[in-house]
Amino acid sequence: MPQYKAPLRDMQFVLHELLNAEEHYAKLPDFQGNVSRELVDQYLEAAADFCENELSPLNQVGDREGCTWNDGVVTTPTGFKEAYQKYIELGFPSLSAEEQYGGQALPNSLGIAISEMVGSSNWAWGMYPGLSHGAVRTLEHHGSDEQKNTYLPNLVSGVWTGTMCLTESHAGSDLGIIRTKAEPNADGSYAISGEKIFISAGEHDMAENIIHIVLARLPGAPKGTKGISLFIVPKFHVNADGTVGERNAVRCGSIEHKMGIHGNATCVINFDQAKGYLIGPENRGLNCMFTFMNTARIGTAVQGLAASESSFQGALTYAKERLAMRSLSGPKAPEKEADPIIVHPAVRNMLLTQKAFAEGGRALVYLLAQYADIVEKGETEEERKFADNILSLLTPIAKAFLTETGSESAKHGVQVFGGHGFISEHGMEQIVRDTRIACLYEGTTEIQALDLLGRKVLQTQGAMLRDFTKIIHKFVEANKDNAAMKEFVEPLAALNKEWGDLTMQIGMRAMQNPDEVGAAAVDYLYFAGYITLAYLWARMALVAQEKLAEGTTDVDFYNAKVTTARFYFKKILPRVRSHVDVIAGGLDPLMSLDAEHFAF
């Protein structure tokens, strides 16, 4: 099993050199003078030590043992509970929460870097505290003062954990047809009845209470998504003094037997007139839940990045050690019986693809986290609105594109190992299994694609897209006369223009038949993802070239950055052409076959 090593050098490069984190924090009033480079690095180093030495050794244990269910009680794998207690002691759950509830009020963009390390070392374990973060955010934004005071201190400290209860057996992506009911009680609370499925971390032994955030319908509520409300439903009631009281009528009916993430309990949760409390206005639950869902979607993008990073680390180590055949251009290790497989172009192609997706994905996720900082803490309404537009556009791209490329990277990891990659003990096939869910939960790739093209681009008449393409255009204009950047800037400029043209073409076709949006959406998302990473790789190449010109002593690191950027532009970015061609194929090839003729 590959042992995870936190890529601190690259994380610091993205935070401090590419995204200028210290300057970013200085522009946000809540963080001015409070968040230095030294403080950020201290947290990163502490998290790296925890993830490398506590979580990584438990990754394969969790996969092998899984969770066990016995009469509604779920037991997590060996070591999970103890690792979680240490996580609490180190203060990581409270990192970005508000101080008045026991939080440290540090930036989300620092928290996302720590989440990357947790996810890369042990994704299944990381889902337990990760979902709590979404619950905290939802209550901070939409809860009443009483609800915040009751639930946030223990959620923030990590003593309690949270869940997101949306899905029902008949209602996954289409939440408008959920059936869980909420009947008003005389005391102002609600009796919640129904069954939710696929609830990650829905029951476990790692915390003394679990706070479920639940979507349900009130009596007489409008049909569809306009009739959904949001509720707090604790596993145990909370006494007036904040202590845990009697058990609520919430029970885990079973846990799923899954392809991957065995260490995380994926639960069927039954609510039998469980007492719940309304969050926000009646029938506005989906609006409130989007706070949780958007947090979860960025978190899932981190899973894609984590898959690329962890599979790259395992494959790289193996490729340097495994001997097979001689290089086609002559022996590279003549003293050995064969050359290391890293000398072979096909192996290098897979390794560089993993590296390009991991490092490009890191830049994208950290950029999103900075925009999230501005949305919450920006000084002016104009700044917050602009950041929210960019964040809204890039979130479906990051969630879908990074999880799909993470899955690709994981498969490359198995392929580099050859037959050994198929053997469980090496741990590479676990990454494939654990990562596959990332393309499904928190909105499938296809749902994210519809969100991007339909809601974020076409419904805004391209306003959000123009905000982002203007950023790319500004970068292109600033560097068009830089000879060293020509190989990056020229193709980026052309594709940036094509992005707008392609959008207009799809929009015109969609005016004739709205199904054209569905036909084009996934390829459009891939097109957008490849360009977005190209923009970030061009920025990284520029920073690296500037450091090399200054005479840095870290020559190898910066040369590798430029070389990987060149690989991305020459070997990965050309994939956009196939997506453009597929979009041009239109709707008819998909819809001309009658449903009854799909036969076997």
Segments and roles (model prediction):
Residues M1-G126, T150, D373, V582-F600:
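Amphipathic, small/basic residue-rich leader segments at the start of a protein or domain
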Residues P2-K5, P184, I261, L367, ...:
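Alpha-helix capping/hinge segments and adjacent helical runs
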Residues Q32-N34, E65-T75, G285-G299, Q313-Q354, ...:
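Glycine-rich cofactor-pocket loops
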Residues F80, Y128-S132, G143-N185, E195, ...:
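Internal maturation/activation junctions in enzymes
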Residues H133-A135, S144-Q147, E442-T444, L452-N496:
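A structural-propensity feature for long, helix-poor, extended segments
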Residues S189, S193-R247:
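A short core secondary-structure module
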Residues F198-S200, F236-G253, K258, A265-A296, ...:
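A glycine-rich, basic-preceded beta-loop-alpha segment at the flavin cofactor/substrate interface
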Residues Q459, F475-F600:
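C-terminal amphipathic alpha-helical interaction region
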